[in-house]
């Protein structure tokens, strides 16, 4: 899978060695990244007006001092960002109930450290592709809403009857339009 050039992988991990290794791995695969040392730092980044206009994903350590990865994930859900920013949890302490709960809440994946570089990059690329699809759907929806808002009342009446499945002749009769 070809990475999306304008995509960003956000890395939140309290371990500087892990952050640096992940950033290096992603750079070697031509995937831009941005690193954060804590859940609070990433939460502040979001508070400063982050708007996901480009595909992205989040590599998120589960256990961190202060704001845990799970607490940050809940904050993403509350902000409505979890879908457009797929979350791949990283953990050195596999905990099946935690993994199951995170996936039930919408996490994209749950990877145990140490992980295979290739497998992780494959998951990241799939997450970015999912983000890109959702952002494209959101843009399309916004475009359709704009077009609908520009319709005249008469055009809306015609559209409503077309959507009800009426043939042109019946629409013309109902709206008293000559054919």
Where does each model-flagged region fall?
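Receiver (REC) domain active-site loop signature in two-component systems and cognate sites
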Residues: 64
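Acidic catalytic/metal-coordinating carboxylates
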Residues: 37-38, 68-74
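Two-component/phosphorelay signaling modules centered on CheY-like receiver
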Residues: 2, 7, 15-36
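Helix-turn-helix DNA-binding segment
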Residues: 142-179
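C-terminal output helix
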Residues: 95-97, 111-124, 170
């Amino acid at each position: 899978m070809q990475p999306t050039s304008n995509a960003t992988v956000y890395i939140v991990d309290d371990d500087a060695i892990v952050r640096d290794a992940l950033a290096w791995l992603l750079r070697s695969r031509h995937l831009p990244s941005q690193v954060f040392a804590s859940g609070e730092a990433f939460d502040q980044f979001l508070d400063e007006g982050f708007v996901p206009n480009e595909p992205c994903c989040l590599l998120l350590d589960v256990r961190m001092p202060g704001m845990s990865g799970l607490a940050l994930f809940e904050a993403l859900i509350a902000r409505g960002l979890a879908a457009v920013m797929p979350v791949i949890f990283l953990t050195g302490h596999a905990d099946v109930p935690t993994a199951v709960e995170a996936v039930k809440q919408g996490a994209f994946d749950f990877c145990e450290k140490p992980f295979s570089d290739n497998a992780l990059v494959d998951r990241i690329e799939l997450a970015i592709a999912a983000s890109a699809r959702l952002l494209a759907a959101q843009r399309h929806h916004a475009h359709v809403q704009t077009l609908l808002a520009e319709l005249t009342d008469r055009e809306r009446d015609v559209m409503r009857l077309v959507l009800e499945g009426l043939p042109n002749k019946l629409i013309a009769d109902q709206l008293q339009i000559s054919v």
